[in-house]
Amino acid sequence: MSPISNFARIALACTVAALLGGCVIAGDVRPYPAMAPIQPIMPPQAEPTAGAIYAAGPTLQLYSDRRARDVGDLLTITLLENTTAQTSANTATNKESNLSLGTPSILGAPVTLGGKDILSATAKGARDFTGKGNSAQSNRLQGSVTVTVIQRLPNGNLVVQGQKNLRLNQGDELVQVQGIVRPGDISQDNTIPSSRVAEARIVYGGRGPVAQSNAMGWLSRFFNSGLTPF
């Protein structure tokens, strides 16, 4: 066997191995999108007026609790998210066509050749299509994330943002939370459930072997995409 044939076989084997590896190897599943840290925008502090009895300054509440109300305060959001979605679609089409041309006649006599009709024709056609799809998804997320008040809106609502990074064994876990909360919904222990957060964006993701094992390879994604003609 010639060296060229051996090289061609080795190259073909390497190509097939790479394609098969694409079915099982995938890159890291990264959270969407990476949230850059934002420093709280502190409101300008008024300078005290020398010689006056009253001097403007930060709010001092003698009898209030420690609930978040100003920029830079911390707030704990309790994550209690449960979502369930299910969809089903069925499509069926059927079309039939029939065409029949009878034997023409001349002066009342049919046109034949050897006693057989030569100008008559019959055509039939039928098309059927059936499609069916089902999708079901259920998600549950529980935990807590302490966020920072980054802005106080004119109506008193608070814009909050925060994230939590965990490194467990060989994987990284990331939880990001952004949204708007109403001070009246904050409990006395300075916590609020995630269901009370408006414009909420809650992201949970990870990187590592566990995330890779749940990701589909690029070749598998191709055969499950709309690019395939099947």
UniProtKB/Swiss-Prot annotation:
<protein>
    <recommendedName>
        <fullName>Flagellar L-ring protein</fullName>
    </recommendedName>
</protein>
<dbReference type="GO" id="GO:0003774">
    <property type="term" value="F:cytoskeletal motor activity"/>
</dbReference>
<dbReference type="GO" id="GO:0071973">
    <property type="term" value="P:bacterial-type flagellum-dependent cell motility"/>
</dbReference>
<keyword id="KW-0975">Bacterial flagellum</keyword>
<keyword id="KW-0449">Lipoprotein</keyword>
<feature type="signal peptide">
    <location>
        <begin position="1"/>
        <end position="22"/>
    </location>
</feature>
<dbReference type="InterPro" id="IPR000527">
    <property type="entry name" value="Flag_Lring"/>
</dbReference>
<dbReference type="Pfam" id="PF02107">
    <property type="entry name" value="FlgH"/>
</dbReference>
<dbReference type="GO" id="GO:0009279">
    <property type="term" value="C:cell outer membrane"/>
</dbReference>
<comment type="similarity">
    <text>Belongs to the FlgH family.</text>
</comment>
<feature type="lipid moiety-binding region" description="N-palmitoyl cysteine">
    <location>
        <position position="23"/>
    </location>
</feature>
<keyword id="KW-0472">Membrane</keyword>
<feature type="lipid moiety-binding region" description="S-diacylglycerol cysteine">
    <location>
        <position position="23"/>
    </location>
</feature>
<comment type="subunit">
    <text>The basal body constitutes a major portion of the flagellar organelle and consists of four rings (L,P,S, and M) mounted on a central rod.</text>
</comment>
<dbReference type="GO" id="GO:0009427">
    <property type="term" value="C:bacterial-type flagellum basal body, distal rod, L ring"/>
</dbReference>
<keyword id="KW-0732">Signal</keyword>
<keyword id="KW-0998">Cell outer membrane</keyword>
<keyword id="KW-0564">Palmitate</keyword>
<comment type="function">
    <text>Assembles around the rod to form the L-ring and probably protects the motor/basal body from shearing forces during rotation.</text>
</comment>
